[in-house]
């Protein structure tokens, strides 16, 4: 299994240049590039060609653009914006040889029937599939374990991916989001493992279902999630994708970027290596 870094872990105490430097130094195989802030910030003073050259001359490679945000149940103007943004992402993915784009469902206070959520998600993801196909890019739907997210459990997300029925549409399995809204472990046991494109590794303080927020995340193995159970199921089912550590904890933003990146690796390796062989270079 290969190790990936998600830039949310140093959201407030680093930038793409530093993240790449310290991830390369600490033996990460991949990075998920944040398209809403870290990439635009980088492009103020650098070019995509410079970024491409970095990846060509170093071990670390880009795994995903993270993320196409709030893609479903939008009005006509919002829908057009999403499609335009996604087409731009395809050009970035092509330039940097990035295999995945993460797609995040709408978060809203509005009550929307699950049937309407599914219909919209299936329609948009099917269109994204068509757009992505010539680029060889896959789209990974990331359900968010929060009551206000329109797709907030593994089972709901898996049903949507199944309904789309395209090889280039799958899931992000985030351990925090799985735990946070009480996703059913039996749904994971029954899932087609080829539909899980990316594994997000994290842990959390022990708050009740429905009360957890991203800020409650802690280093893998330092919280309340039964990570061993999830990892053993993934191992048994033959998961072969990357594991990407993703934390949003404010107190970790007080650390130096290098310390956070090293600790994220060490804690992830400690948890994951009980079940998978990690191929990190350092």
From Swiss-Prot:
A divalent metal cation binds at residues 142, 174, 200, 246. Binds 1 divalent metal cation per subunit. Its EC number is 5.3.99.11. Pathway: Polyol metabolism; myo-inositol degradation into acetyl-CoA. It is an enzyme of class 5 (isomerase). Its cofactor is a divalent metal cation. Pfam families: AP_endonuc_2. Keywords: Isomerase, Metal-binding. Belongs to the IolI family. This is Inosose isomerase. It comes from Halalkalibacterium halodurans (strain ATCC BAA-125 / DSM 18197 / FERM 7344 / JCM 9153 / C-125) (Bacillus halodurans).
